A protein has these predicted regions:
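Secondary-structure boundary elements
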Residues: 113-194, 202, 210, 277-279, ...
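Alpha-helix N-cap/helix-initiation motif
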Residues: 12, 189-193, 231
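A structural signal for short, well-ordered beta-strand segments
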Residues: 21-23, 91-93, 164, 242, ...
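Ser/Thr-centric signal marking residues that sit
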Residues: 23, 179, 261
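Glycine-rich, flexible loop/turn motifs
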Residues: 101, 107-110, 170, 177-185, ...
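Hydrophobic/aromatic-rich core segments of domains that either
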Residues: 3-4, 166, 198-290, 294
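Glycine-rich, small/acidic residue-mixed loop/short-helix segments
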Residues: 38-48, 53-56, 262-292, 296-299, ...
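Linear, non-domain "peripheral" regions
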Residues: 1-145, 154
């Protein structure tokens, strides 16, 4: 594992995780060339530090590179030219995540009326981009109607977020395989089922419908359920949630995260890999292959485990 900085023990209160994300593609015929690009490296921020990261690709690529996009996400590119029937991409990370400041949710802008978090009219606000609808549009009358009960006038922002997350959690059924990455928010509204990506996108559409700046967040969720409690959905899988922009002191802002899949606000169990306006900005992997293969199978496995000490092993 290549370290971004010296591997020291995490600070008090910080949670250290090891994340192993493995994707395997199997094809019915030989693939002569594979191009891939994805977002698999956890971000660095005030409360998250990617201590080390390694991306292993088998067969080994003839060309690979890493870059940073306009949102600050780390994008990895590779080109495999060796003929193959199986392609395996393994991302291995060590990440430190600190808990939110004690006053993030129970005080400050989170307790202000939700209308105060609208970036419109704030000088030089870069968050305005995150208020805009997508193409094709997601903000419809049906979305506005669904959002309305949560957005009562002058209601504290944190209450809006909790209520919206809770309503989506209650009103919709988590059903793996019920949607695809191209399923629209309004289709999810009609079907009343989906997966974490769908529920995050619905929450984002509701927030934007009311003039708030909201972003799509991809990453991982670490859970260690109490005795007798069910494990939360999202364990050992990629996860997605929503965040809303809030102005803090002059020149500063915070993203407040909400997870409608699990009916909770975001804390130190959430590991951020990418932020964007939608899933399409931060997919874990996408690519192009050259082959006569008629069939393919993809297997994805994710392990998120607490990590102690300062020794790393392959």
């Amino acid at each position: 594992l290549s370290a971004d900085s010296s591997l020291s023990l995490p600070l008090s209160g910080t949670h250290r995780y090891r994340v192993t994300h493995r994707t395997e593609y199997r094809y019915s015929d030989v693939v002569t060339s594979s191009y891939g690009r994805g977002f698999l490296t956890p971000r660095n921020s005030l409360r998250q530090r990617c201590v080390a990261h390694r991306l292993t690709i088998d067969p080994a690529p003839a060309d690979r590179s890493t870059s940073r996009d306009g949102y600050g996400n780390i994008s990895s590119y590779f080109h495999v030219t060796e003929p193959h029937r199986t392609l395996t991409i393994t991302s291995d990370s060590i990440v430190d995540v600190s808990p939110p400041p004690p006053g993030l949710y129970p005080s400050g802008p989170a307790l202000q009326p939700w209308e105060a978090a609208r970036p419109a009219g704030l000088p030089g606000s870069l968050a305005t981009e995150f208020t805009l609808d997508l193409n094709p549009p997601e903000i419809t009358d049906a979305v506005r109607e669904y959002a309305a009960p949560s957005f009562l006038p002058k209601r504290p922002l944190v209450e809006v977020l909790r209520d919206l997350a809770s309503r989506i959690y209650t009103d919709f059924t988590y059903r793996s395989g019920s949607t695809t990455i191209s399923t629209g928010v309004n289709e999810v509204l009609l079907a009343r089922e989906g997966v974490c990506q769908d529920f995050a996108r619905l929450a984002i559409a509701c927030l934007r419908a009311n003039g708030l700046a909201a972003c799509y967040v991809s990453g991982y969720l670490a859970t260690d359920p109490p005795p007798g409690k069910d494990r939360m959905i999202g364990i050992d899988a990629t996860h997605a949630w929503a965040s809303v922009w809030t102005p803090q002191q002059p020149g500063r802002f915070e993203w407040l995260g909400l997870d409608p899949t699990n009916d909770q606000l975001v804390d130190q169990r959430y590991i951020v890999v990418g932020r964007g306006r939608d899933y399409a900005d931060v997919p874990p992997l996408r690519g192009i292959i050259y082959t006569n293969s008629e069939n393919s199978v993809i297997d994805v496995s994710v392990d998120v485990v607490p990590f102690e000490g300062d020794a790393l092993h392959a």
